[in-house]
């Protein structure tokens, strides 16, 4: 048989509507479910977790021990104490309220400051917006100019094994305040427009 890996570190961070049921809820014998406390509690707690079919449990333990030896005991105990003694569901709900405000700030700023040729996702949760620019724009090559403008992003090619996504970028709204998001998107929009103008001049 074939096992399905359900990598869902942002599954609890939905804010427009309830998150869909996990695939593992429908098939616990064929789905491996992965999560991470670094997304839901604190970014410095670099501990992941997995729900696996019973038939794979021993193999996964061996694979984990051979690859990472042992995660930090201190971090594991910190997480265990937090989950036992703190209202973590309420904490996640408050995080989602903050992220929704920041998501909205980014979407509004993209509409105001990015060229009409650009398109982007409207995420219902998580940390990121995916932006597509015209195909002639290479976001990896454009990165140094963005950094000069004091903004950064992840080029789309980082998410593909074949070089695809060169005209795409991933923007994060997780950490900055709405005001900083607006400033950053405005600056990045100027960089994108200048790059489009330069590319257009080169083609003419």
In which residue ranges do the predicted regions lie?
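PLP-dependent class I/II
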Residues: 1-204
């Amino acid at each position: 048989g074939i096992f399905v890996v359900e990598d869902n570190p942002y599954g609890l961070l939905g804010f427009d509507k309830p998150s869909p049921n996990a695939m593992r809820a429908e098939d616990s014998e064929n789905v491996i479910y992965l999560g991470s406390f670094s997304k839901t509690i604190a970014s410095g707690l670099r501990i992941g977790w997995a729900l696996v079919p019973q038939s794979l449990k021993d193999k996964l333990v061996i694979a984990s021990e051979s690859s990472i030896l042992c995660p930090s005991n201190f971090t594991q105990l910190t997480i265990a104490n937090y989950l036992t003694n703190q209202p973590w569901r309420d904490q996640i709900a408050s995080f989602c309220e903050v992220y929704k405000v920041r998501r909205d700030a980014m979407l509004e700023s993209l509409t105001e400051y990015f060229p009409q040729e650009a398109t982007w996702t409207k995420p219902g949760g998580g940390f990121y917006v995916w932006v597509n620019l015209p195909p002639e724009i290479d976001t990896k090559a454009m990165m140094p100019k963005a950094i000069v403008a004091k903004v950064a992003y992840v080029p789309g090619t980082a998410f593909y094994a074949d070089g695809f996504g060169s005209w795409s970028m991933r923007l994060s709204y997780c950490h900055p305040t709405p005001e900083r998001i607006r400033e950053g998107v405005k600056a990045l929009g100027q960089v994108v427009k200048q790059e489009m103008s330069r590319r257009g001049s080169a083609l003419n």
